[in-house]
Amino acid sequence: MLEVNILDKKWYSIVEDPKGFTLNIINASLKELKIDQYKPNISIALADDNLLHQLNLRFRQMNKPTNVLSFPCEQLSSECDLGDIAISIDTVRKESDEYHIPIPAHVAHMLVHGLLHLLGYDHQKKGEEVVMKNLEGKILASLGYNMCAI
């Protein structure tokens, strides 16, 4: 089951139906990854800088907001609790302006990025980063988006 919690009304200024948009991106990504049959449980918080700052400080000891955080729970299996994703509308909006990326495309990128972290992908090392970025690009292309420059 996919759960989407809209914690900031600013999300409605991005897309008319933030929950539907989020569900479509995650479901299409799971299908593109050929793992939709597992029907994983994922909770997604569409939040703001305040919450992402708190979470980033608590779990990563970084005293600043960030665009997306992922909290893996279980490894992929049938109906597993895959984990949680939180995205800040404020940081995503700033990055979209800075890099001239349409906001919905950047939100899609952050959702895919967060999902890949739940699945165990990382970008701490160069080789891992290349694998993750290539997979992000493939998924985003399947959704009709160009790979964003972040």
UniProtKB/Swiss-Prot annotation:
EC top class named in words: hydrolase
Keyword Flavoprotein in annotation: no
Localization of this protein: Cytoplasm
This enzyme's EC code(s): 3.1.-.-
Binding site for Zn(2+): H113, H117, H123
Keyword Cytoplasm: yes
Cofactor: record remark: Binds 1 zinc ion.
GO cellular component term, pick one: cytoplasm
InterPro entries noted in UniProt: MetalPrtase_cat_dom_sf_prd, YbeY, YbeY_CS
Any GO BP: rRNA processing
GO molecular-function term, one example from the UniProt record: RNA endonuclease activity
UniProt keyword list: Cytoplasm, Endonuclease, Hydrolase, Metal-binding, Nuclease, Ribosome biogenesis, rRNA processing, Zinc
Principal location class: cytoplasm
Residues of the signal peptide: none
Residues that span the membrane, as ranges: none
Cofactor(s) annotated in UniProt: Zn(2+)
Function: Single strand-specific metallo-endoribonuclease involved in late-stage 70S ribosome quality control and in maturation of the 3' terminus of the 16S rRNA.
Family of the protein in this entry: Belongs to the endoribonuclease YbeY family.
NCBIfam families for this protein: rRNA maturation RNase YbeY
Protein name: Endoribonuclease YbeY
Natural source organism: Wolbachia sp. subsp. Brugia malayi (strain TRS)
Gene name linked to the record: ybeY
